[in-house]
From Swiss-Prot:
Presence of the UniProt keyword Magnesium in the record: yes
Range of residues in the leader sequence: none
UniProt lineage: Bacteria, Bacillati, Bacillota, Bacilli, Bacillales
SUPFAM superfamilies referenced in this protein's UniProt entry, alphabetically: HAD-like (SSF56784)
Name of protein: Acid sugar phosphatase
Pfam families listed in its UniProt record: Hydrolase_6, Hydrolase_like
Function: Catalyzes the dephosphorylation of 2-6 carbon acid sugars in vitro.
Family: Belongs to the HAD-like hydrolase superfamily. NagD family.
Gene Ontology cellular component annotations, sorted alphabetically: cytoplasm
Cofactor(s) in the UniProt record: Mg(2+)
Keywords in alphabetical order: Hydrolase, Magnesium, Metal-binding
Enzyme Commission numbers on file: 3.1.3.-
GO molecular function list: metal ion binding; phosphatase activity
């Protein structure tokens, strides 16, 4: 396997499952740190701030700094701020998204007369919130969604994800949003911009083909699939565009890198 100069790394299913570290995750990050190889954690989670994500990883023994975390909320806020500085926004979502938006100088409003409607995962979503978002889009606001994951794994099972909430507004208005998170290029290009390396020197590491591996393929970087999450080795073998590599787990990746 090629030795890359930097890595983009998925979290759920790659680094951890729920609140438990996946075997090999801490060792993989330790290896990268010992070799002074830069890496970023790229997550579609818009509800958490980078500090919270890093704290969770550190609690599991996986070394992480807040500035190594790229969330769909951060990428969304930067996308809007670059396109329309100081724009007004109506949003669905948590503090991770609201803080990211205001940090970029965007103005949050609680009505449908705005420049942008942004939908992020909102665990307190209501009919009224969906109605305001729908009216905002109908009024001409640009429609943005942090990510298109229709379901998310929780202790109870797979629960509705942000893609499911987004679809309510999309179906009602007939307007398709601009998606920011994986597998879309927007969040990946943001992460690559931070690394500032040639794309041939960067690899994406993840477990889910449709999200993680496709995110790498969509921005022309190599991909490393680990069989510790959703997509199995058997499913990978059936893909018309396979990942560059597939491994049982991150321990196998370390062994390859140490050769």
């Amino acid at each position: 396997m090629k030795n890359y100069k930097a890595y983009l790394i998925d979290l759920d299913g790659t680094m951890y499952k729920g609140n438990e570290e996946i075997d090999g995750a801490a060792q993989f990050i330790s290896y990268l740190n010992n070799q002074n190889i830069p890496h970023l954690y790229v997550t579609n989670n818009s509800t958490k701030e980078p500090e919270e994500v890093a704290s969770k990883l550190n609690t599991m023994g996986i070394v992480a700094q807040a500035d190594e975390v790229v969330t769909s909320a951060l990428a969304t806020a930067e996308f809007i701020a670059e396109e329309s500085p100081g724009a007004t926004v109506y949003m669905l979502g948590g503090s991770g998204l609201s803080n990211a938006l205001t940090a970029q100088g965007l103005v949050l409003k609680d009505d449908e007369f705005v420049d942008y409607v942004v939908v992020g995962l909102d665990e307190q979503v209501t009919y009224e919130k969906l109605s305001t978002a729908t009216l905002g889009v109908r009024n001409g606001a640009k429609f943005i969604s942090t990510n298109q994951d229709v379901s998310i794994p929780k202790e109870r099972g797979f629960l509705p994800g942000n893609g499911a909430i987004t679809s309510v507004v999309s179906v009602s208005t007939g307007v398709q949003p601009v998606f920011i998170g994986k597998p879309e290029p927007i969040i990946m290009n943001k992460a690559l911009e931070i690394l500032d390396l040639d794309r041939s020197d960067v690899a994406m590491v993840g477990d889910l083909y449709d999200t993680d591996i496709m995110s790498g393929i969509n921005v022309d970087i190599d991909t490393i699939h680990v069989q510790t999450g959703v997509t199995t080795k058997e499913e990978i073998e059936k893909k018309s565009v396979p990942p560059t590599y597939t491994f049982k787990d991150l321990n196998e990746v370390i062994k390859e890198l140490e050769k």
